[in-house]
Regions:
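Helix-loop junction within the histidine kinase core
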Residues: 105-116
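Short helix-loop "hinge" at the ATP-lid/N-box region of the Bergerat-fold HATPase_c
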Residues: 172-173
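Primarily the dimerization/phosphotransfer
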Residues: 34-73
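Short conserved segment of the HATPase_c
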Residues: 213, 227-239
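Short alpha-helical segment of the dimerization/phosphotransfer core of two-component systems
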Residues: 89-94
């Protein structure tokens, strides 16, 4: 009987024989893929653990630098103040680098959790500006923010919104030349995609689009060199660096992290830019958050 079975198999069309062997091949691929994923997870977790271990000593170091800068331990001459300022700036960059990496690893594992609590967007943004004001002054840049009294408190994750703004301000401060200006602005916004049903007629759509705002739009504008049109989507990809800017500080994660955080809040981000005319990064956050929005993914 075995001879007959063997003969039957040999007489099968080549396509049928390939189909019989396909499951074994697919299973092998699945095992290899799982092995690669497991190795990736272990490597990512190890790097995240190392980065996390650096946070505490770096925070202590930055704290002592701030204490010395305050001159509470004794006066500093001009040269010493200059050195301390450079040390503090370097420490802040390293701290931002570590935080970017830690946030990225959490986003990759899908473990990020949003905490929607009623907050005041004006207060949220003014706190970020206060934190960044010294950095902008050191770089010879002007940073402007004017509170908008049309904004009312609504539920959003303030620390993560501040993280998004910080990444956008960091990006603006890197590429805006000395003497340039950066504006931070927020306003109520009617996000039509979120409120107009697909089944509505054209007339209904027009009437619905006149409803009250259902989102907040936040924008960061700069007087930098601008971004070429072909890169205005790609800049939100993981580890992307604009050609010619590979030597700039950072891992190319700031905008990618901002995009993922906003996706987790049910929001979106985009850029409007012209060469030699600056860039304007804007994002939307819904007034009624979508609690089950996943923080992972590559499409909006």
């Amino acid at each position: 009987m075995s001879t007959g079975a063997s003969s039957m198999k040999e007489n099968l069309p080549s396509k049928s024989r390939a189909q019989m062997s396909e499951p074994a091949f697919s299973n092998e691929n699945v095992r290899e893929l799982e092995s690669l994923r497991d190795r990736y997870r272990k490597t990512t977790n190890a790097l995240a653990s190392a980065a996390h271990d650096l946070k505490t000593p770096l925070s202590i170091l930055n704290g002592y630098i701030e204490l010395l800068q305050s001159q509470k331990l004794g006066p500093l001459n001009d040269r010493q103040r200059e050195v301390m300022a450079d040390m503090f700036s370097s420490g802040q960059r390293l701290q931002h680098f570590i935080q970017d990496f830690l946030t990225y690893t959490v986003l990759e594992t899908g473990e990020l959790r949003m905490q929607f609590v009623e907050n005041d967007m004006n207060v949220c943004l003014s706190e970020v500006c206060r934190i960044w004001s010294n950095r902008f002054q050191e770089r010879g840049l002007a940073l402007y923010f004017l509170a908008n009294d049309k904004l009312t408190p609504f539920p959003f994750d303030a620390p993560k919104v501040q993280r998004v703004i910080s990444n956008l301000l960091e990006n603006a401060s890197k590429y805006t030349p000395q003497g340039g200006t950066v504006w931070l602005h927020a306003e109520p916004h009617m996000w039509e995609r979120r409120s107009v049903s697909k089944s509505a007629s054209n007339g209904d759509r027009r009437r619905q689009s006149n409803n009250a705002p259902n989102a907040v739009k936040v924008s960061v504008s700069d007087t930098g060199p601008g971004i070429r049109p072909e890169f205005q989507l790609e800049i939100f990809d993981d580890f992307f660096r604009l050609p010619g800017n590979e030597a700039t500080d950072g891992m190319g994660l700031g905008l990618a992290i901002a995009r993922r955080l906003l996706m987790g809040m049910g929001g979106k981000i985009w850029v409007e830019s012209e060469l030699e005319a600056g860039s304007k990064f804007s994002f939307l956050i819904p007034l009624n958050p979508i609690l089950n929005s996943p923080p992972r993914g590559t499409s909006q």
